[in-house]
Amino acid sequence: MDELLETLGLSEHRNKFPSELSGGQQQRCAIARALIKNPKLLLCDEPTGALDSKTSRDILILLEKINEKYGTTMLIVTHNNAIKNMVHKVLIVKDGLITKDYINETRVAAADLEDL
């Protein structure tokens, strides 16, 4: 638990309620709750929704770090087109149908994403 809180940057907030945290910290808290049981798959529905650009980037860097550190596979559902540049496999869905399905050969680190 301590390692997870440290990884997520929540150590100093360990005794706070989520309502006492900023939007980005609340998002990290939600990620911590999802990771506490060491899942092999993490489903992320709009992980950057309602966050400003800097906090969005911080959350994506965090997800990238979790993937590398714990080997957690992630399925990210988003309307944020920039995120497709950091992922391995991209599926684009329109009107309930997959319109594109490809492997991203030119992945960009989350820290280098533009237009978040």
Predicted regions and their residues:
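Conserved ABC ATPase signature
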Residues: 17-21, 25-27
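Hydrophobic anchor residue at the start of the ABC signature
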Residues: 31
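A short, proline-enriched helix->beta-strand linker immediately N-terminal to the Walker B motif
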Residues: 36-40
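Catalytic Walker B motif of ABC-type/P-loop ATPase nucleotide-binding domains
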Residues: 42-45
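Helix N-cap at the start of a conserved alpha-helix in ABC-type nucleotide-binding domains
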Residues: 53-55
